[in-house]
Amino acid sequence: MTEAFARAKINLTLHVTGQRPDGYHLLDSLVVFADVGDRVRAEPAEALSLAITGPQAANLPVADDNLVLRAARTLGGQGARLTLEKHLPVASGIGGGSADAAAALVALARLWQVPLPEPAAVLKLGADVPVCLEGRAVRMAGVGEILTPLAAPLPEGWLVLANPGVSVPTPPVFKALARRDNPPMPDDLPGWPTVEALAAFLATQRNDLEPPAIALAPEIARTRAALAAQRGCLLARMSGSGATCFGLFAAEEAARAAAEAIGAEHPGWWVAPARMVG
């Protein structure tokens, strides 16, 4: 048996800078990962199959077009018994399905002893699959296929992720965008020696999908406000197309205390503290 961890993908920034003739949107995004996520296990078998377990399994029925199965078919036609242990909320802006697909590729490449595909080769599975396969902090551009490593390592920091239990499909959020030709991030990203410096930079940047997502799901604004109100929160923002928001913290103790406080006040929300992975 082989196993791979599917970390949550976090868009610290997400600038929508254009739209191609085929409809795909051009992005400029600073992407990191949180040390919380799903797990994909692969065991030898004659046929390809998938079982879904875990606390979020009920929200993701097994279907033939599941990204884990699609990723497996991309890698080859061999058999395997796949198990997806689902912890991340579905359709929540933190790349759960894309991270699962990337983890399936990693687990199956080990099981079948075949090379991993290049990140750009898996773009057809979804715009976030290449960056999830990369698995480290990068600047993501194009439609998700241009991945540029950061010049300097990110400072150590913590995230609190919060989702109000609302599923936000991505297409309506993009459709509701007021503009699709927004300015990108600076050409040269500065180094960030501290989490405070990173937060100060992020405050000058944006998630262009946040306003249309809030218009579709006002709970997102309340989630962001709940994070921002916590002691030690340096910045609160929506990730991806929502509805998950993140709070950036310098210290583990403050992040865990914030997650506990939000969870107590909003018992129906999904809340998780996690180390930021660069």
Swiss-Prot record:
<comment type="pathway">
    <text>Isoprenoid biosynthesis; isopentenyl diphosphate biosynthesis via DXP pathway; isopentenyl diphosphate from 1-deoxy-D-xylulose 5-phosphate: step 3/6.</text>
</comment>
<dbReference type="InterPro" id="IPR006204">
    <property type="entry name" value="GHMP_kinase_N_dom"/>
</dbReference>
<keyword id="KW-0418">Kinase</keyword>
<protein>
    <recommendedName>
        <fullName>4-diphosphocytidyl-2-C-methyl-D-erythritol kinase</fullName>
        <ecNumber>2.7.1.148</ecNumber>
    </recommendedName>
</protein>
<feature type="active site">
    <location>
        <position position="128"/>
    </location>
</feature>
<dbReference type="GO" id="GO:0005524">
    <property type="term" value="F:ATP binding"/>
</dbReference>
<keyword id="KW-0808">Transferase</keyword>
<dbReference type="GO" id="GO:0016114">
    <property type="term" value="P:terpenoid biosynthetic process"/>
</dbReference>
<dbReference type="InterPro" id="IPR020568">
    <property type="entry name" value="Ribosomal_Su5_D2-typ_SF"/>
</dbReference>
<dbReference type="InterPro" id="IPR004424">
    <property type="entry name" value="IspE"/>
</dbReference>
<dbReference type="InterPro" id="IPR036554">
    <property type="entry name" value="GHMP_kinase_C_sf"/>
</dbReference>
<comment type="similarity">
    <text>Belongs to the GHMP kinase family. IspE subfamily.</text>
</comment>
<feature type="binding site">
    <location>
        <begin position="89"/>
        <end position="99"/>
    </location>
    <ligand>
        <name>ATP</name>
    </ligand>
</feature>
<dbReference type="InterPro" id="IPR014721">
    <property type="entry name" value="Ribsml_uS5_D2-typ_fold_subgr"/>
</dbReference>
<keyword id="KW-0547">Nucleotide-binding</keyword>
<dbReference type="Pfam" id="PF00288">
    <property type="entry name" value="GHMP_kinases_N"/>
</dbReference>
<dbReference type="Pfam" id="PF08544">
    <property type="entry name" value="GHMP_kinases_C"/>
</dbReference>
<dbReference type="InterPro" id="IPR013750">
    <property type="entry name" value="GHMP_kinase_C_dom"/>
</dbReference>
<keyword id="KW-0414">Isoprene biosynthesis</keyword>
<dbReference type="GO" id="GO:0050515">
    <property type="term" value="F:4-(cytidine 5'-diphospho)-2-C-methyl-D-erythritol kinase activity"/>
</dbReference>
<feature type="active site">
    <location>
        <position position="9"/>
    </location>
</feature>
<comment type="function">
    <text>Catalyzes the phosphorylation of the position 2 hydroxy group of 4-diphosphocytidyl-2C-methyl-D-erythritol.</text>
</comment>
<dbReference type="GO" id="GO:0019288">
    <property type="term" value="P:isopentenyl diphosphate biosynthetic process, methylerythritol 4-phosphate pathway"/>
</dbReference>
<keyword id="KW-0067">ATP-binding</keyword>
